[in-house]
Each structure stands twice: as C-alpha cells, then as structure tokens.
C-alpha cells in the first residue's frame, strides 16, 4: 500500500486516515476519497449510495415529524400561528386541516396525526437506509438490474429522470385531489375573511396559466408569484401534473437525441450539479413566493407581507382619524400630497404617505373597499366592516421585520416586541439555501466539466512545494 507522505507523518494518530482501518471498497485507497468526503466514496457502489440516500430521506422525514409534534405541543390556539414562530402548522392549515372561518384553528388533532405519520415513515426509511448502507449488496447491477445503473449510460439516466418526473407529477395531483375532493383547501379570499372551501371552477386555460410564466418578474407584474386566486393555483397544478407525468413517460421511452448527448456532461458529478442548480432555482422562487404572496401563503397563518403590513397601517389610521372627524378625501399631508389618499401613477385612488410605494398590494381585507378606480371614497366612509379594522390593526403591528437571530421589530424602535414573522424565517432561509446550492452547482459543474475534459486532478502533486520541505517536527 502506498502511504501518502502526510499520512506517514501522523502514523501515531489513530484516525480513519490510517490504512489499518479499511471499509471494504470505501477507503481512500480504493475510491480516491477519504472518509470525510462522504458519499463521494460511494459513486460507483449503487447499493451503498442507495442506503445513503434512503437514510438521508429518513433524516428529512424525521425532522418533519419531530418538528411537527414540537409545534403542536407548543401551540396556543388563542394566538395567531405567526406569533408563535410556527413554520409547519401554517402549511397544514393552508391545506385546510384543522381550521375554519377566518383561519381560526378548531382542531389540532390532524396536526398531531401528520407528525406521527412522518415519524413512523422516518423509522421505515431509517431502517431501509441502515440496511442498504450496512447489510445490502454493495452494487445493485448484478442482482437487481432494474435498479442498477452506470452513470454514463445515457438511456438509463433519462429513464431514472422519467421515473422522478412521474412521481413529481403524482405529487402535484395529490394537491389537486385535496382541493377538489378531500375537504378543500384554505382560501384567504373567501367572503368575510377566509374559509376552507372545495375548489370547483378550476382555471385550465393555457393562456392564463402560461401567461404567468410570460409576465415580467418586476413590480406590478410579479411573474408566477403574482398568482392571487386558488383556481389558478390548483389549475396550475393540474397542468404541472400532466406535464411532469407525460414528460416522465417521454424520458422513459426515448433515448437522448444527438444534440443532448453532445450538450450535457454524462457523469454522476454532472447530475449532482444539475440537481443543485434546480434546487437553487426552487429556493429563490420559494423565497419570493413566501415573501410576497398572500394567497398560497395566507396572512392568517404566515402573518402579513411587508407591503400588506404597511398598507394596513395607513388603513388603520385612516379609520381612526375619520372617526375623529378628518375628511380623509381632501386632507393634505406634509408634502402637499394627500395625507390619507392620493392617486397612483395610473390614476387609481391609493393610500397616501410612505405606503404609496406599495399601492399595488392586493389583500382580502382591503379589496372589498375598492371600486373601478381604486379605493372607493364612498365605501371608505360607509362600508368598512369591524373585521377589516381588526385585521388591519393586527397586521399593522406584525410587519415581517426582524433578523434571523430572532431579534424582532424595527432596529430603531425602543418599544419593539420580540416578534419575527415566519415570512422572514422562510424567505431568508430559502434565499440563503438557494445561494449556497447555486455555489455548489458551480463547484460541481466545474469539476464535472474538468473531469470530462480530462484535467480534473488540479495541481500536479509531484511538483507541490510542500513535498520538498522539512517536516515541522
């Protein structure tokens, strides 16, 4: 066995670097990777790599179940979810479980069931992961050719891609079935302040669904993040389900065309880089969705969006001052613009003051007060309902401010409450993860392309200066 110089110097230290400790087919000598390089040692051991992936899935599902039960145990029904730092229960509530009109939690038992089911699933996955990592066959090709693969086998790789796409499509259909037949989902736009309802009138028009994809991503347009009714969301999932299932069948039945064979690098590390790029895109989209969208992420559970809290503040003070006798239609602010109401660049009546920048916010508590030309002065004077006042006052005091280290509120505000919105948590974490996954994509894509070109080894180790230096000791 050839001992590396750096290993020989530390022969007295008992670590996995020592050649004495050998994991069959998983040591540095046979794989080129040391123990800390993790699954890189298993690149060509399909059975062991399966074990690693199943065990990883078990860890993910265990977190979901344990965190779910933790949130149930700490949940206080009298307080809104977003005041309690919850990130899982809002997702379950959005799916229509355990909630009623106005997003009020009526029953926490479905949440408990969800946690227990995830824990049980994680035990099954954990057992499977340990079995395949320690006891199962090292490679699957010989015994189970259907599950075996070689990374450079393009046809097999696209077949695996196809199977994954079909599973994603079926997952998409699960949401559609829940919304249509199994109790419905929570609709924040339901009259009177939100309720659980079955979706009856799906949007299936391709011009509407794909129109979202063609929108500008910037203000007033907002690309797919601008979706603001459940019919479009569930209809989009119908389209997505069919596209994924048919795309999956296509990839199973066909072989890659010549242009695709030339365009892609066909190696394990290349597939890793493609996957990381996809996850990075998902992370950035999720970040924007949870930050700006109050239909897929109802404010009753996640707290108001930033623009929503700002508009709620303007509305709350309009209500107060109108009661005190102010003429909100004509009062001037310090800049000479309207103090309570003004006009947008396109002529609609909007809230005045600093919140003017959020004039294109749409929120269920505000829309009933709009007419054909923006906010309707008549409705503002005669039609404001108590639930709208209560909700806007609540949202005004729960803006999604605060940092990842749980210090809530405006940094300059001496009376700030220590409140951090789940929107802050979820959008920041997904942005950060999206960024790191993108860096991982660049790293592995670079390595994969270099390997394909035949120069992945980096610096020639024979010429490395350290080899000619005296040992430190």
Curated annotation (Swiss-Prot):
Residues 1-14 form a propeptide. Pfam families: PSII (PF00421). Keywords: Acetylation, Chlorophyll, Chloroplast, Chromophore, Manganese, Membrane, Metal-binding, Phosphoprotein, Photosynthesis, Photosystem II, Plastid, Thylakoid, Transmembrane, Transmembrane helix. The chain crosses the membrane at residues 69-93, 134-155, 178-200, 255-275, 291-312, 447-471. Gene3D superfamilies: photosystem ii from thermosynechococcus elongatus. GO terms for biological process: photosynthetic electron transport in photosystem II. [CaMn4O5] cluster binds at residue 367. Binds multiple chlorophylls and provides some of the ligands for the Ca-4Mn-5O cluster of the oxygen-evolving complex. It may also provide a ligand for a Cl- that is required for oxygen evolution. PSII binds additional chlorophylls, carotenoids and specific lipids. One of its GO terms (molecular function) is electron transporter, transferring electrons within the cyclic electron transport pathway of photosynthesis activity. Belongs to the PsbB/PsbC family. PsbC subfamily. This is Photosystem II CP43 reaction center protein.
